Regions:
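Mobile beta-alpha loop/short-helix "lid" or hinge segments that flank ligand
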Residues: 37-48, 101, 134-158
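Acidic/histidine-enriched, beta-strand-rich ligand/metal-binding domains
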Residues: 90, 103-104
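N-terminal beta1-alpha1-beta2 submodule of the flavodoxin-like/Rossmannoid cofactor-binding fold
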Residues: 1-97, 160-173, 186-204
Length: 204
């Protein structure tokens, strides 16, 4: 089972990417995935959506096809978003506009919101409300909000708040188990063919 983790921060060396790499290893260590991969939006690797995607523009195909194949080969996702000005970063919202060919469809995704303080609730609400309609990604009812992120999940234990760090590590294992179970279950749903329709290609 492959789980792909999308680090939604535009920043280089971001806390979102730190958490993504920690979670990727946790999924492997706990037998919740057989393969993981982190795709980072640091540095804005994906241009803003335009009609060239629909028209088969060669430049878009060269950029997106390799990533499309990786997404299509994944059984589930972890979507990590920092909270910027109470919002999901523009690059992460743009990411969801690019996949209309079933790469994400009917696959489970765990939302992980990242906050440097006690916030983090707004990205969860925003992603659940407005990022799934046409790509049909399936968000779990479980989510994580990693608060005071600079003080947890650091490789250098001296930088961690021991109690908070332990809590988040345990909660990540719990959420990873749920994601893994959903990935197994929804694979059968997709393979049944019930989700495929040439008529109803877009959500309502």
């Amino acid at each position: 089972m492959k789980i792909m983790l999308i680090s939604g921060s535009h920043r280089m060396n971001s806390q979102s990417e730190k958490v993504a790499h920690y979670m990727a290893q946790s999924l492997l260590d706990n037998g919740q995935a057989t393969a993981t991969e982190v795709f980072s939006l640091a540095g804005n690797p994906l241009p803003l959506w335009d009609e060239g995607i629909w028209n088969g523009d060669a430049a878009w195909q060269a950029l997106l096809n390799p990533l499309s194949e990786k997404l299509a080969a994944s059984d589930g996702f972890v979507i990590l978003s920092p909270e910027w000005h109470g919002q999901v970063p523009a690059g992460l919202k743009n990411f969801f506009l690019l996949w209309g060919s079933g790469e994400l469809a009917h696959k489970p995704a765990l939302i992980v919101s990242i906050s440097s303080s006690d916030g983090g609730a707004y990205p969860v609400a925003e992603l659940r409300m407005s990022s799934y309609k046409n790509n049909r990604i399936c968000y779990l009812p479980e989510h994580l909000i990693i608060r005071n992120v600079e003080s947890v999940l650091n490789a250098d234990a001296s930088k961690n708040n021991p109690e908070t760090d332990r809590y988040f590590r345990e909660r990540i294992v719990y959420a990873g188990g749920i994601l893994s179970a959903y990935a197994n279950a929804l694979k059968g749903v997709r393979e049944s063919g019930i989700t495929h329709s040439d008529v109803f290609r877009f959500g309502m």
